[in-house]
Amino acid sequence: QLLAQTLDCIAAPDTLVVIDPVMADNGSYYKFTTSQCVVRVYKNPIRFAMYDKNNRAVIYEEAEPLAFGLKTTQTMRRSGDEDFYGCGMQQGNFSYAGKEADIEVTGWDEDQSSNPAPFYMSTKGYGVFRNTFAPGHYAFNGTEMLDKNYDDGFKLMGFTSQLTHNENRFDAFYFYGPSLKDLLNDYTDITGKPFMPAMWMLTMGDADCYNKGEQRTGWPQSTPDVISQVADKYVEYDMPRGWILPNDGYGCGYVKLDSVVTELGKRGFHTGLWTENGVDKIAYEVGKCGTRLCKLDVAWVGEGYEFALNGCKSAFEGIESNTNERGFVWAVCGWAGTQRYSTVWSGDQVSNWDYIRYHIPTITGAGLSAMNAATSDVDGIFGGSPKTYTRDLQWKVFTPIFMTMSGWADADRQPWVYGHPYTDINRKFLKLKMRLNPYAYTYCHEAHMTGVPMARAMVLEFPDDVVTRDTTTQYQFMSGEWMMVAPVYTRKNVRDSIYFPAGEWYDYWTGKKYEGGKWLDKYEAKLDICPVFIRQGAIIPMYPDMNYVGEKPADVLTLDLYPYGNTSFNLYEDDGLTRDYKKGEFARTLISVSSPKGEKGTITVDIAKAKGDYKGRYQERTYLLDVRSESSPSNVTVAEKPLSAISPEAFNAGQEGWYFDASDRMGRVKVRTNRLSTNQDQKIVIGF
């Protein structure tokens, strides 16, 4: 770091570990040695470089001295096989080798910037955060330098990157990973970890306006109308739900807020407000009426990234100052540090098939700047159609946070609006998202601790696979560690160009097996199918079917298992609502599965006793195992006691036991236990 001033985008400058490097004069440069790398400071002209700990392999090197003036530019050498990620939310982009990125808001269309961040990282193992609120421009496509040969025989071809901000100062943090996940952790050590969402925030949000006179409905609206016109219909159509903004729109106020919040809560909704005039009423809105979400707008946040970040902070802290529950902010303009408080959203857009296509790398690219809660409106706010709505919704259920916004297009954006078959398909995917809450919640906690997002560009999970590094796989992503999603973004019910990294992969819907290192074309995906593939060894925890968080107890835990070798999943749970987890009130449950690799043999499932505690933790649980297997087992034991083979009917009626279904996704073993203590280790063995 060079002469850093503490800006609001820095979260905790006093908590950084101070490193005491060993300095030496090496003639043409000063050498600063740490346990992981060496920093060279060349004397004439002054330039910086980073090498490995042996001072032989170059990691980065400035090609020329910093250029100061009205703008400050850093020029870096780059290798021909080097790729770059970060730069915040850039519409339609996540990988920048040979490209340019605006580090300022330029718009909401493809190839524009909606939520920039002055940060990037490289496949060479380093990252840079420019500590500034000044707009900038990063060009990873310069070619004017001569090639350079290094001591270790490495040749750095004459490519450069020019990194510019509109100010006459230079203040930067450099990170050495070497992995991309390490770099995200380092970056968020400085700018702050992504906020930990309450579990209800992982359900679909619904935004509309019920105090706007020009609304196109043709009938007078008042805030309480949201209850009968929207909330009750979610109940009528058996639709999962979680949060709602009844005053989403310019000019919206609200009436009878306290009773509206109460009635919406009875129907499974948390209530938020579009906040246009600041947060001066937030004590009343949150503390007395019970709202839990603020949507911000430039109308009061003001122009500039510092104002926007301070607005997020004020709203977030305003919520948390008036309740023990967690803050939630919907931001218009993000920057480095926004991830501490807010979801970042890609803007007001017209939906079509291209909208779906380019939002895949938009969201995964934002994740590569630690924006775990990056999202966009389902089917945009303008345009759209029944099919684009359904296709857009079905892939977004595999991301942490998403919402709809009604009142701008001819058709509203509730999931039942287009009727059959779309209503049924939308319900299917929303119910799946609810069931996947323990999986998503665990990965959101990982994001909160490390900066690594849940919706991951393929390169983040498979960094050694060169196919994943550039835009080749930009239209697919990993949801957590185990689920790969390849959305359909054309009118045809076919998805081409699906890439499988090394290992075995299984179709989530049919169980068909695919070998890694290969491509798949012409995957048939009818409208009710989003291509999803499960990685070998997967452990996917699921809660019971429910329409909102807390509707039913979650004391039955399903484990969707794809045994292959030794794998594990460290389930994270807390009360799902309050900030008591910050006091240590949470529990981890390590779930481990061991089996032969790709062969028939004994499958052992170990469920460790819960480590930690919190109010409401289940002391006992029933476990349902849904295990991929191409053949029927000969026996199943729970805690070394034999489990009886039973009929599917008895199983579904709640009886303890197991059965094998050869017709279910190429073979599944179903196991149901009685209620077992979560304070003791549990072992389930499936023998063949």
Question: Each PLM stretch: what is its role?
Answer:
Residues L2-P13, R40-N54, E62-A63, F195, ...:
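Extended Gly/Ser/Thr-rich low-complexity repeat segments
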Residues Q221-G249:
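Catalytic domains of carbohydrate-active enzymes, especially glycoside hydrolases
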Residues Q1, P21-E64, F477-M478, E585-Q619:
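Acidic, contiguous internal or C-terminal segments within carbohydrate-active enzymes
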Residues T6-I10, T15, Y51, Y60-E61, ...:
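Aromatic- and carboxylate-enriched substrate-binding clefts and catalytic-loop regions
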Residues M23-D208, W219, A231-D232, Y523-P544, ...:
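Catalytic and substrate-binding clefts that recognize carbohydrates or anionic sugar/phosphate headgroups
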Residues M204-P224, T275-D280:
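Active-site mouth loops of central-metabolism enzymes
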Residues K641-N679:
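Extracellular/luminal ectodomains and secreted, surface-exposed scaffolds of diverse proteins
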Residues E317-G318, G327, T338, T343-V344, ...:
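Catalytic core of carbohydrate-active enzymes
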